[in-house]
Amino acid sequence: MNSVGRRGPRRANQNGTRRRRRRTVRPVVVVQPNRAGPRRRNGRRKGRGGANFVFRPTGGTEVFVFSVDNLKANSSGAIKFGPSLSQCPALSDGILKSYHRYKITSIRVEFKSHASANTAGAIFIELDTACKQSALGSYINSFTISKTASKTFRSEAINGKEFQESTIDQFWMLYKANGTTTDTAGQFIITMSVSLMTAKXVDSSTPEPKPAPEPTPTPQPTPAPQPTPEPTPAPVPKRFFEYIGTPTGTISTRENTDSISVSKLGGQSMQYIENEKCETKVIDSFWSTNNNVSAQAAFVYPVPEGSYSVNISCEGFQSVDHIGGNEDGYWIGLIAYSNSSGDNWGVGNYKGCSFKNFLATNTWRPGHKDLKLTDCQFTDGQIVERDAVMSFHVEATGKDASFYLMAPKTMKTDKYNYVVSYGGYTNKRMEFGTISVTCDESDVEAERITRHAETPIRSKHILVSERYAEPLPTIVNQGLCDVKTPEQEQTLVDEDDRQTVSTESDIALLEYEAATAEIPDAEEDVLPSKEQLSSKPMDTSGNIIPKPKEPEVLGTYQGQNIYPEDVPPMARQKLREAANAPSTLLYERRTPKKSGNFLSRLVEANRSPTTPTAPSVSTTSNMTREQLREYTRIRNSSGITAAKAYKAQFQ
């Protein structure tokens, strides 16, 4: 029989030998990133490592969401992504202090609008990967203040390809709003993904040294009470104002086959709008140039001291109105423009202004060749309207700073006169067109260019030019006729060409002198010059002189034929009447019909009522028919001086 020993003591000894000592473990605090991946299903814990276990050096990816609040309609600033990101302490003061390297791989910037739908303006953002910019330099990325929107930037745009040291910023985001008020605009909500690498171990068993006790401060004398600081005044709001109006001038016209004259310009009433208030202001105007061919008006706009973006819209149409009587203000015609491509609206310095980025768009509308206005047609390139859109940046210095707006030339010859004809010169009111001048102190260049490009051009107008140009030279107001600009220093206006406002008696005297100059034997040269003839050849009675297809013989004198070019217009008409009338009429005395025209009465008073005017002997004597033809040919081709020299050979 086998015996079995006691197992109790043996079991006790075995338990004693198997008893393990407890090992003291120094706790180590290690920041562990979030684990991306599924959890274990069986719930078993991983085997423990050593006491100083460190997580995988590649780290992980964290997602941070933070906001930038209380953005105003005129706010600006910079958001620095990295250890300087004060808007997100979880990144700058938290996780970046636990890792050596990091990189931000993507960000999503959402602008959440808190503004009303009527709030105007936009907020622009720009990414600076060099971390050096102090102000916004690009206006490509923007959000409308009144709308919520978002933008996403990948690693290529934010320098997120490579890991950065956790002590330096990866990139900055600069922002700036272009509103003019301090109204609330909204907030930025920014979501970013951050990759981390090389964690730092923080040993919590090693106590940090206690700070040394500060020395007892030496008591300081009680300072004198300081005055209560005054509150910082609010910034001065940016100015935005506008001039709108239609300037006018007084002109004198007679028949539409005659030139016009202009009166001195003065103050022009313009509508002035600023801060939603409207009032009437008077600006100065004057003729910058004036001669017998054209006159050019300039309008002076005062500008407060500062820097402004200016946009000007001009719709040039020289409408003419009647003055006085029961029809005061009734439309009576127009003065057309020339078709010169360089005769456009322009801007220049009048006092204390400098310009840059001057952009001008010029258009015109010609008159149709079949249109007839006051018995005149638009068959020679006359322009009915001249419009322009101009924008530029102006720096105004001094309290009296101003710039001038130059209108296209007002043509004074009969070619551009489409006003109802009258027997004598009378004053009429001429408009220069509608002008709008807008000045904005906000100095947003991108908005100025956009405003210029979006200004509508009149439908079907012909584009003359659209380009950056130089402003006009500085001018001063020196009166009606004596203004000189630097471009006109070599062009002197003769005394005979200078225009003044004449009275009716002065005009009548000039008409009388011009008429008596055509009377035979009044002067040596009785033939009218080219300057005395208008575009439509007419005699002094107002009859159109027909152009003969073949040489017309008006009569004979001393055996020689008399041709139309050999006699003055008045004698030419008398000879035609004598040739067409019955022979008995040559000897009848007929009472001449009295004309109501003032000039005709003056001319007829100096004529003999019985004897008709005969051809000038000084023109036709001692010359054969062939010599007369040669005389006429020389006069038409070489001028009156050469013709006189030829005629002197036979006297």
Curated annotation (Swiss-Prot):
Annotated stretches, region: Readthrough domain (RTD): 202-650
InterPro entries: Luteo_coat, PLrV_ORF5
Keyword Amino-acid biosynthesis carried by entry: no
Compositional bias of kind Basic residues: 37-48
GO cellular component terms listed in the entry, alphabetical order: host cell periplasmic space; host cell plasmodesma; membrane; viral capsid
GO MF, any single term: structural molecule activity
Phosphoprotein keyword on record: no
Keywords: Capsid protein, Host cell junction, Host periplasm, Membrane, RNA suppression of termination, Virion
Region (Disordered): 1-25, 33-52, 201-239, 525-552, 606-626
Pfam families: Luteo_coat, PLRV_ORF5
Polar residues composition bias: residue spans: 531-543
Extent of Low complexity compositional bias: 608-621
Pro residues bias: start-end ranges: 208-236
Family: Belongs to the luteoviruses readthrough protein family.
Miscellaneous: This protein is translated as a fusion protein by episodic readthrough of the major coat protein termination codon. It is composed of the major capsid protein fused to a long C-terminal extension called the readthrough domain (RTD). Readthrough of the terminator codon TAG occurs between the codons for 200-Lys and 202-Val.
Name of the protein: Readthrough protein P3-RTD
Record organism: Barley yellow dwarf virus (isolate PAV) (BYDV)
